[in-house]
């Protein structure tokens, strides 16, 4: 009996560009295969927990296969830390299941509400890219359902082209059913954190550059509305996993305790315009002033350090019904002026982004459409109705392209297809791979049609 589908209005986490699709929630790989077979003439895309900010997991008028019912952990090797699980397993589920045994996910983005399949398809990165690379570097294999109905076990050694086309390939080579990941051994579930408050963008970049060798995890929250001599002032947090000896005596009895929970929930409806230049300037001032000028050795929980926004359920609602656009770029080292000029334009136009994050990326990842490259990455959240937003983002596009940089496909919701080739030099390789493994174009999304992927 075919798996039922039902019409559902979908958006990305940014809540822009809603479309209707026929959504199914298969319980196992056989049901996924049946859905793909039945949808050959309509088109299909996989969807996890819906944390892509854009329409990467939307498929207007077509079929969306939601994998969140497929969340079994299939095996674990306590010697190597390799875990095999279904694609719908979330990073939070892995943390909850394996932190008590001393294992953590190798790479975590800013939310733990991401499925393993989605983490591979977006090749997500975290605060440790300079030391650990992106998520797919820690994947040893995955089972991929391709358009011909076959299930292939793909490894970087057996099928490198398909592996690195799928990692960062936004779900367009097939549906990931299962994956094997190498977890990271940790002694505690706490982070030993150092904090520095910087005065301007020069000090911020200098401190970030000096931090790479000493910390596994580093990030800067940046005040995007600061001007003049305070342009780019930031609060930098850097950390490594704590040892048992680093903990307070009372916490040493349960060094691997982990109890994730959202503290509060955002109301179903927030008024439009609550996030604006005036409120963000006030929030930025408070956030900056409350940070210590310098503090070392603070013990933080995983939730506080890695996923502060997960403490608010549906935090995306605070931007109002119009939603928000996240804009994230990376430019090569040597293009520091692009970051400076970006902040100058943002502050001049008073474009409000409270969640403004600056990081350094390490060695580039092998994925054909993987986002990271060695350089500076800046991420910004703007209310969708921000005045002059289209003009501002077009100006930032020019700066990024001129420096040989790129935008993140898991977040972009607006660039035209002609910008893809200069940003992603292996786009032609990806298109050839898609033509080979999916000649009829069974897999597709609103994102892939916009960008001609």
Language-model features, listed with the residues they occupy:
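Noncatalytic alpha-helical scaffold of FAD-dependent oxidoreductases
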Residues: 1-453
């Amino acid at each position: 009996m075919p798996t039922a589908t039902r019409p559902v209005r979908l958006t990305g986490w940014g809540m822009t560009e809603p479309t209707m699709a026929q959504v199914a929630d298969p319980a196992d790989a056989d049901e996924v295969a049946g859905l793909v077979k039945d949808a050959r003439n309509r088109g299909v895309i996989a969807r996890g927990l819906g944390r892509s900010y854009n329409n990467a997991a939307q498929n207007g008028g077509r079929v969306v296969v939601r994998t969140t019912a497929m969340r079994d952990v299939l095996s674990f090797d306590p010697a190597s830390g390799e875990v095999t699980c279904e694609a719908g397993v979330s990073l939070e589920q892995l943390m909850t299941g394996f932190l008590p045994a001393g294992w953590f996910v190798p790479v975590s983005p800013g939310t733990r509400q991401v499925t393993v399949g989605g983490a591979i398809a977006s090749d997500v990165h975290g605060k440790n890219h300079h030391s650990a690379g992106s998520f797919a570097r820690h994947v040893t294999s995955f089972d991929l359902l391709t358009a011909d109905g076959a299930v292939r076990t793909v490894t970087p050694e057996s099928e490198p082209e398909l592996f690195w086309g799928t990692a960062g390939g936004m779900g367009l080579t097939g549906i990931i059913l299962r994956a094997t990941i190498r977890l990271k051994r940790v002694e505690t579930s706490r982070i030993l954190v150092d904090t520095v408050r910087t005065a301007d963008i020069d000090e911020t970049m200098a401190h970030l550059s000096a931090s790479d060798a000493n910390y596994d995890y580093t990030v800067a929250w940046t005040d995007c509305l600061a001007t003049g001599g305070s342009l780019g002032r930031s609060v930098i947090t850097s950390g490594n996993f704590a040892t048992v000896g680093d903990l307070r005596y009372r916490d040493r009895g349960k060094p691997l305790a982990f109890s994730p929970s959202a503290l509060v929930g955002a109301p179903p409806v927030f008024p439009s315009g609550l996030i604006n230049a005036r409120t963000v300037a006030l929030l930025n001032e408070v956030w900056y002033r409350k940070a210590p000028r310098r503090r070392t050795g603070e013990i933080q929980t995983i939730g506080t350090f890695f996923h502060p926004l997960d403490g608010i359920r549906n935090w995306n609602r605070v931007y109002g019904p119009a939603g928000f656009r996240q804009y994230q770029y990376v430019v090569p080292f040597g293009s520091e002026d692009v970051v400076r000029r970006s902040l100058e334009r943002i502050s001049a136009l008073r474009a409000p982004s409270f969640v403004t994050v600056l990081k350094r990326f390490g060695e580039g990842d092998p994925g054909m459409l993987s986002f990271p490259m060695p350089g500076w990455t800046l991420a910004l959240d703007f209310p969708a109705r921000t005045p002059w937003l289209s003009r501002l983002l077009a100006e930032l596009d020019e700066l990024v392209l001129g420096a040989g940089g790129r935008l993140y496909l898991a977040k972009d919701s607006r660039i035209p297809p002609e910008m893809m080739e200069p940003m992603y030099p292996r786009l032609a390789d990806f298109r050839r791979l898609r033509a080979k493994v999916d000649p009829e174009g069974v897999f597709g999304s609103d994102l892939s049609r916009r960008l001609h992927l």
